[in-house]
C-alpha cells in the first residue's frame, strides 16, 4: 500500500513536470500574429446568430428594448410623448418618429413599462388629473406598469390595462386617460390601439428576462455547455486557428449570483475555454463585450433598451470587471490578452472618458501580469482611427483593435465582387497601415467576416474575398479575428467556411 502510494506520488510528479514543461514549450512556441476566431453568441447572446434560442419565450416579440408605436384606431393618430418626454402624452400625430416611439421594459410576459425618448416612463398621474397619462417619471413603478392585452385574432391590436384595472383611452387627440372599463375590439373603441414594432433587441438581457427567473438559468447553462466544447477547440487547432477571442459581459464578475435577469455560471464556461485552449496549444483573448450602462447601445452590449449610458460614472465598476478577469486568468499560460471594451461608440463615449478608463483598466491588468497584452478597441462612429496611438505608445504591450466589415454603411451597398476586393486591397490596407506604427502599439483586426452586400455571389467569389482579407489583415502585427465561429448565417461562420472549403488556413 505504502509503496503503491509512493509510486503514485512519483508518477504524479513526473506527469506534473511533463504538463509544466509542455505548457512552457507551448508558450515559448507562441508567435504573433495570431489567427483567431470570435466565440460570439456564447457568453454574450446575439439573437441574430441563432434566433431559435428565443423560440420558447412567450410573447417573444415583446422583449426588453422592443420599440413600439401605438396608433389609436378611433382617431387614426399616434400616441406621442410631447417634447420627447417630461410632460403629457397626447394622441394627435399623423406620423410617427422618435417622440412617438416607446421602448418596452418587460416585467413578465404580459406586463410592461414604456420608456419614452427622453428616458422617462409614461404612467398614470392621478392627483387632480383624472388618471391622465404623462411621461414624467424617471423610474418605473406601479403607476407606470401596464398589461398589454392582445387581440386573439390580431396580436398587433392591443389595449393597455393600467394598474387601477382600467384601460388607457384616447378620449380626444389631446386627452389620454387610464379610466376606461369597456372591452370591445371595434375600431371606434377609444381604448384600441394598433401596435407597430419598429425595432428589436435580442441580447443577453432580452433572452434571460424573456425566459424569466424560473427558466433562464437552465436554458443559459445548457447553451454554455453545448454551444462550445472541447471538440470545437480541437477543430480550430487542427484547422490553423491558434487563438480565440471570447466576448464576455460585465455580469461575469458577479458570478455565481449576478443581478437579475442575468444568470450565474458563465465564469465556469470561461474556465473551460482556458482548459481546452491549454489542451490544444491555443491562446485566449478575453474581450469585455458588454459593459454596464452599455457602451454602444447594441444588443451585444447587454443593453436593456438600447440607450447608450456608459460614461465616467461607470468607470469604477467596469475597471473592477477587468480586475476580476485579470485576477482569475493571469496565471494561465493560455491568456494572451485582455480587451478592455468592445466597440465604444462615439460621440456618446468621449475620448476623455475612454482614455481615463483604458488607463485604469490597463493598470488593473498589470497588477496581475506583465505579459498579457492589453487591447484597446478604437471607437466606432465619428472618430479618428489614430486617436489612441500616442496614448497606447506610452504603455507596454498594448494593441489597437479595429473592426473591418464591408457592411453597415451605404457606401458598401452597391459594390460588386471586384469592388469589394479592391476596397480591401486599397482602403483597408491603408487604414490598417495607419494604425500600425513602428514603435507604437500592435494592431489587431479583431473582427471581420466574409459576408457582404453582393447578391448571388459564387463560392469562388467568396473565396477570393476571404483570401484578399486574409492577405491584408495578415499584416496586422497582433493578428486577426474572424467573426464568428458559429452562426446561423453560413458566411459569418468560420466553422462552416472551413468545412465547406471557402476558407483554408492550413
Ligand atoms: C510549435 O510550432 C510548430 C510549428 O508551428 C508546431 O509544429 C509544433 O507542434 C508546436 N509545438 C507545440 C508544443 O505547440
Ligand atoms: C398635439 O397636442 C399638443 C397639446 O395640446 C399640442 O401642443 C401640439 O401642438 C399638438 N400637435 C399637433 C401636431 O397637433
Ligand atoms: C406579472 O407582473 C404583474 C405586475 O407586477 C403581476 O401583477 C402579475 O401577477 C405577473 N404575472 C405573472 C404571470 O407573473
Model-identified regions with their sequence ranges:
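Short, solvent-exposed loop/turn elements at domain surfaces
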Residues: 43-50, 78, 408-411
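Cleavable N-terminal signal peptides of Sec/SRP-targeted secreted and luminal proteins
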Residues: 8-25
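Active-site mouth of glycoside hydrolases
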Residues: 32-36, 41-66, 199-372, 383-384
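Active-site region of glycoside hydrolase catalytic domains
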Residues: 31, 198, 294-454, 470-471, ...
Amino acid at each position: 500500500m505504502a509503496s503503491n502510494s509512493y509510486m503514485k506520488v512519483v508518477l504524479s510528479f513526473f506527469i506534473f513536470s511533463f504538463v509544466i514543461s509542455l505548457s512552457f514549450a507551448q508558450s515559448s512556441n507562441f508567435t504573433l500574429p495570431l489567427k483567431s476566431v470570435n466565440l460570439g453568441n456564447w457568453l454574450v447572446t446575439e439573437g441574430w446568430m441563432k434566433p431559435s434560442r428565443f423560440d420558447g419565450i412567450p410573447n417573444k416579440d415583446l422583449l426588453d428594448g422592443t420599440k413600439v408605436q401605438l396608433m389609436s384606431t378611433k382617431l387614426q393618430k399616434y400616441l406621442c410623448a410631447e417634447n420627447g418626454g417630461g410632460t403629457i402624452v397626447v394622441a394627435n400625430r399623423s406620423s410617427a418618429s422618435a417622440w412617438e416611439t416607446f421602448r418596452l421594459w418587460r416585467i413578465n410576459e404580459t406586463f410592461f413599462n414604456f420608456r419614452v425618448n427622453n428616458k422617462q416612463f409614461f404612467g398614470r398621474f392621478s392627483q387632480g388629473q383624472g388618471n391622465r397619462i404623462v411621461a414624467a417619471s424617471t423610474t418605473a413603478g406601479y403607476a407606470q406598469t401596464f398589461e398589454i392585452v392582445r387581440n386573439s385574432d390580431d396580436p398587433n391590436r392591443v389595449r393597455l390595462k393600467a394598474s387601477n384595472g382600467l384601460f388607457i383611452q384616447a378620449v380626444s387627440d389631446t386627452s389620454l386617460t387610464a379610466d376606461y372599463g369597456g372591452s370591445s375590439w371595434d375600431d371606434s373603441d377609444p381604448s384600441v390601439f394598433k401596435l407597430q414594432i419598429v425595432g428589436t433587441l435580442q441580447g443577453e438581457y432580452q433572452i434571460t428576462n424573456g425566459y424569466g427567473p424560473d427558466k433562464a438559468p437552465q436554458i443559459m447553462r445548457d447553451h454554455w455547455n453545448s454551444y462550445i466544447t472541447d471538440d470545437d477547440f480541437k477543430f480550430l487547432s487542427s484547422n490553423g486557428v491558434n487563438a480565440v477571442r471570447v466576448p464576455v459581459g460585465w455580469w461575469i464578475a458577479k458570478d455565481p449570483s449576478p443581478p437579475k435577469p442575468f444568470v450565474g455560471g458563465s465564469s465556469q464556461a470561461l474556465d473551460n475555454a482556458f482548459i481546452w485552449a491549454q489542451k490544444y496549444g491555443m491562446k485566449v483573448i478575453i474581450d469585455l463585450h458588454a459593459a454596464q450602462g452599455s457602451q454602444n447601445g447594441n444588443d451585444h452590449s447587454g443593453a436593456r433598451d438600447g440607450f447608450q449610458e456608459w460614461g465616467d460614472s461607470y468607470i469604477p465598476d467596469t475597471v473592477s470587471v477587468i480586475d476580476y478577469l485579470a485576477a482569475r486568468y493571469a496565471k494561465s499560460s493560455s491568456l494572451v490578452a485582455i480587451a478592455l471594451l468592445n466597440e465604444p461608440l462615439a460621440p456618446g463615449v468621449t475620448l476623455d472618458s475612454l482614455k481615463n478608463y483604458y488607463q485604469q483598466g490597463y493598470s488593473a491588468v498589470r497588477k496581475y501580469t506583465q505579459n498579457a497584452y492589453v487591447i484597446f478597441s478604437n471607437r466606432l462612429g465619428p472618430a479618428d482611427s489614430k486617436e489612441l496611438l500616442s496614448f497606447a505608445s506610452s504603455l507596454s504591450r498594448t494593441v489597437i483593435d479595429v473592426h473591418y466589415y464591408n457592411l453597415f454603411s451605404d457606401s458598401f451597398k452597391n459594390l460588386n465582387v471586384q469592388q469589394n476586393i479592391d476596397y480591401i486591397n486599397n482602403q483597408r490596407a491603408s487604414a490598417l497601415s495607419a494604425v500600425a506604427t513602428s514603435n507604437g502599439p500592435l494592431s489587431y483586426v479583431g473582427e471581420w467576416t466574409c459576408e457582404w452586400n453582393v447578391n448571388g455571389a459564387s463560392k469562388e467569389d467568396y473565396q477570393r474575398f476571404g483570401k484578399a482579407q486574409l492577405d491584408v489583415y495578415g499584416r496586422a502585427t497582433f493578428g486577426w479575428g474572424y467573426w464568428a465561429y458559429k452562426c446561423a448565417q453560413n458566411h459569418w461562420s468560420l466553422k462552416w467556411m472551413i468545412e465547406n472549403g471557402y476558407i483554408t488556413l492550413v
